[in-house]
Amino acid sequence: MARTDVLVFQHVAVEHPGILRDFLRADGLTWQAVELDLGEAIPDLRDFRALVVMGGPMDVWEEDLHPWLRDEKAAIREAVVERGMPVLGVCLGHQLLAEALGGEVGKASRPEVGLLEVELTEAGRRSDFLAGLPERITSLQWHGAEVKRAPEGAVVLASSPISAVQAFSVGSRALGLQFHVEITPATVGEWAVIPAYAAALEKTLGAGAVARLEREAAERMATLNRTARVFYDNFRKVTGI
């Protein structure tokens, strides 16, 4: 039986791989999403070539509220350590990847929300995961927690004034991104219906923030999507997926 190319861990329906789905389809790659927040079981990792872990409104330490987080972290650790699978973590997925591999995650000094810049570190400028990208990248941020300490052996690839670990890699198989590269024209509107996200947005950017962010994202969408394509192509090239 042929393996599915990509397994996707989702934590809320609206936080899906976004434009990355279009890239996968165009390249003829197959993918399967598992909605962990709905109680869907994690399948056998041997049936997949790669793992993508998306964002969500919960925090990595909320295992009492979301017991499935324990199994998810174990699966991420299995994918990286035992199976050497290509793994991409985005936002919450970035934090889960870090914690699963022995890093530390906690509350950020303040929420980081909006279209903001991250800066590549010296190691990031040399990394094949980030090849072809400028030293400063504008991307969508929407988080209140952060990676406080990257896993042992990880390389920090990008940072911002609020969060020092905006991106990290572990060898040539695992990549974590705190920021969102998967954004589409529908992203801001879809995420704003989640109470926790809407509250963070309004608290950080003020009343009317949803409409303003939607306009700003629309104006920059072409550039944001080109950046996503570079990330996607680099990830495929480096990991061999």
Residue ranges and their predicted role:
Residues 2-7:
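Extreme N-terminal starter segment of soluble prokaryotic enzymes
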Residues 9-11, 36, 92:
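Cofactor-binding loop segments of dinucleotide-utilizing enzymes, especially the Rossmann-like FAD-
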Residues 10-12, 53-57, 144, 179:
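Glycine-rich His-Gly loop
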Residues 14-19:
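Short N-terminal binding/cap micro-motifs at the start of the first secondary-structure element
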Residues 21-88:
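Flexible gly/pro-rich beta->alpha loop and the following alpha-helix that scaffold active-site loops
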Residues 80-104:
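Catalytic nucleophile loop
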Residues 101-186, 190:
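Pocket-forming structural segment of enzyme catalytic cores
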Residues 183-241:
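Acyltransferase
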